[in-house]
């Protein structure tokens, strides 16, 4: 059957710190166009590769990859909240297939996800519950991180399974591009923050969650005024990365180490591995072509903001 792919940057800062109206209208138009293409495709199943920001995954157990057999979005930063419609038996079959292919994919029957998962479902499909979804977490912030090669192999294994289903599959990648918002690091954490990163942060008191979110908002405002206050965005790298994906040259990314990527584009740029997994999964369906490429650095969102679609060819 056919597959359709869309990769999209996410940002929790939408509605909190926005760019000028002309830029906002431009981005909203890009998302609306992608949503129309997806609607015309009429997906029967969504596979969503996305990261977490210490809202569902912590250092008590931090897998490189995890498939949610059950998943709930927490609604951080006013994003959509609620259960994701995961088809249990299909998710279990997917996990077995990927593991049998040699990829050590963890599973969770109670996966907690944040805006990284919720935002693409909300923006591109109109809500969390529109289409059955297989949510796949890819660790993008908590060292040690998976590399490009292993992430690509995960995507290929997922794609081989998806191609056996006789369904119209929408493959989504969520995150990136270049950016480094104020995400905590275990090596630099004080005792309280360390406790949160080891797992107690999964159920934050409302006032603490509000303070945490306000820190990100304040950082975005500072970055808008002074782009030396955080790691700078890297449009050159972002566009090179998107071109490699469009040309199907995923394996060329394998040689880029995690430290090198962080230095080039920021420590949260590792979220782009969700895009790599998505394109690798699409490759299992045969020939494809890209469409709808968009890119703009948006300091207000602390992100090189990208959007890219691809469709299989008969």
UniProtKB/Swiss-Prot annotation:
The entry's keywords: Aromatic hydrocarbons catabolism, Dioxygenase, Iron, Oxidoreductase
InterPro entries: DHPP/DHXA_dioxygenase (IPR023789), Xdiol_dOase_suB (IPR004183)
GO molecular function: 3-carboxyethylcatechol 2,3-dioxygenase activity; ferrous iron binding
Stated name of the protein: 2,3-dihydroxyphenylpropionate/2,3-dihydroxicinnamic acid 1,2-dioxygenase
Associated pathway: Aromatic compound metabolism; 3-phenylpropanoate degradation
Lineage top rank: taxon: Bacteria
The protein's role, per its UniProt record: Catalyzes the non-heme iron(II)-dependent oxidative cleavage of 2,3-dihydroxyphenylpropionic acid and 2,3-dihydroxicinnamic acid into 2-hydroxy-6-ketononadienedioate and 2-hydroxy-6-ketononatrienedioate, respectively.
Keyword Transport: no
Family: Belongs to the LigB/MhpB extradiol dioxygenase family.
């Amino acid at each position: 059957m056919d597959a359709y792919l869309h990769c999209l940057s996410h940002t929790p800062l939408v509605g909190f710190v926005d760019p000028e109206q002309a830029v906002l209208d431009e981005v909203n138009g890009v998302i609306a166009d992608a949503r129309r293409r997806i609607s015309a495709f009429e997906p029967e199943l969504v596979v969503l590769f996305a990261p977490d920001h210490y809202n569902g995954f912590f250092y008590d157990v931090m897998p490189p990859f995890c498939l949610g057999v059950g998943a709930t979005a927490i609604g951080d930063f006013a994003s959509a909240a609620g259960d994701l419609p995961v088809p249990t038996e299909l998710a279990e079959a997917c996990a077995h297939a990927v593991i049998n292919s040699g990829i050590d994919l963890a599973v969770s029957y109670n996966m907690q996800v944040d805006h990284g998962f919720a935002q693409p479902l909300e923006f591109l499909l109109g809500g969390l519950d529109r289409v059955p979804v297989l949510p796949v977490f890819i660790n993008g912030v908590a060292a040690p991180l998976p590399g490009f090669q292993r992430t690509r192999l995960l995507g290929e294994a997922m794609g081989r399974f998806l191609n056996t289903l006789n369904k119209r599959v929408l493959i989504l990648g969520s995150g990136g591009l270049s950016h480094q918002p104020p995400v905590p690091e275990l090596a630099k954490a004080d005792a309280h923050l360390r406790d949160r990163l080891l797992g107690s942060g999964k159920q934050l008191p409302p006032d603490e969650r509000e303070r945490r979110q306000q820190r990100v908002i304040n950082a975005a405002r500072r970055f808008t005024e002074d782009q030396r206050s955080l790691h700078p965005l890297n449009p050159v790298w972002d566009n090179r990365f998107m071109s490699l994906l469009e040309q199907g040259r995923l394996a060329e990314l394998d040689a880029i180490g995690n430290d090198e990527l962080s230095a080039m584009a920021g420590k949260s740029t590792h979220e782009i591995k969700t895009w790599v997994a998505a394109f690798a999964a699409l490759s299992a369906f045969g020939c494809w072509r890209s469409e709808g490429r968009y890119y703009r650095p948006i300091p207000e969102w602390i992100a090189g903001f990208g959007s890219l679609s691809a469709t299989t060819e008969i």
